[in-house]
Amino acid sequence: MWGFIVALISGALMSIQGVFNTDVTKQTSLWVSTGWVQLSAFVVCVLAWLFTGRESVAALWQVDNKYTLLGGVIGAFITITVIQSMGALGPAKAAMLIVISQLAVAYVIELFGLFGVDKEPFEWRKILGLLIAISGIVIFKWQK
């Protein structure tokens, strides 16, 4: 149950963050806004680290799959693409397409066991669910 609650909070925060970041970008620039997002996130993480145990940062160099350390780089591109999509499509349409893309890519990762994730068997019902979600976007976008 806790996982569901955290996922719902995460989705809500992503939508709010996208709107905020898009507004900051309109008043500054894409790179200034993205840099601010990453810098402010870094400050929050450092403060949290200072107050919650101070685990060894050297543990990062012990990570088995070094490519997984690129999460922050990917995060910067996530920020940029969310800002651009929300600016072009509006928050609701952008969020729907973002979620569909997340769902499709996550399924492919599971299906092929990419990045060390446990491989899952192909299931038609998951494809059907994805198609229903895409249909929802078409209905949501439908204009008279």
Task: Describe the residue ranges of each PLM region.
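Structural motif at transmembrane-helix junctions in multi-pass transporters
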Residues: K26-L30, T81-I100
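Hydrophobic/aromatic residues within the transmembrane alpha-helices of Major Facilitator Superfamily
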Residues: L8, A12, I16, V43, ...
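Glycine-/small-residue-enriched transmembrane alpha-helix faces in small-molecule transporters
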Residues: M1-Q27, F77, T81, S135
